[in-house]
Amino acid sequence: YVTAKDYGESGPIPMGCHGGGGVAITWQDKDNYWTFEPYIGNYSACNTPPLGEVPEETWYHVVGVWDGTGSAGAIKLYLDGEIKAERAPAKGNSFQFPGNKWFVIGGDAGAANEADRAYKGQIAVARIYDRALTAEEVKLLYDTLEE
């Protein structure tokens, strides 16, 4: 559950490290959309449609799901409890972290053992699961936050 101080200049909410394999949920300020980017051997991204003008400090519940079954699986992006994008991952995907030492929320685990690309906003809730969530589970998480 996130908000940006300024959606025009918020930056990414990366987790892990793109260089060695990782995932990122990112706000794309040029066209105002969210993207879920699992970098799992090959680049695969899933994007919401452009959201138009976004008022400052608008909160979003953003969930990225990769079912972990390689190129036979699916990458999904949910926004406020609803699926907004889905695609098959690029061929050859596998989760690899050969050189990574850190896992970062709100920045990228940089090569110099320090976080970089810091997110400019607030992250109220961040969760990581050891399995792919179903659409029903994502909706329940959103409904629970809204209560």
Each language-model region and where it sits:
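Extracellular glycan-associated modules
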Residues: 1-147
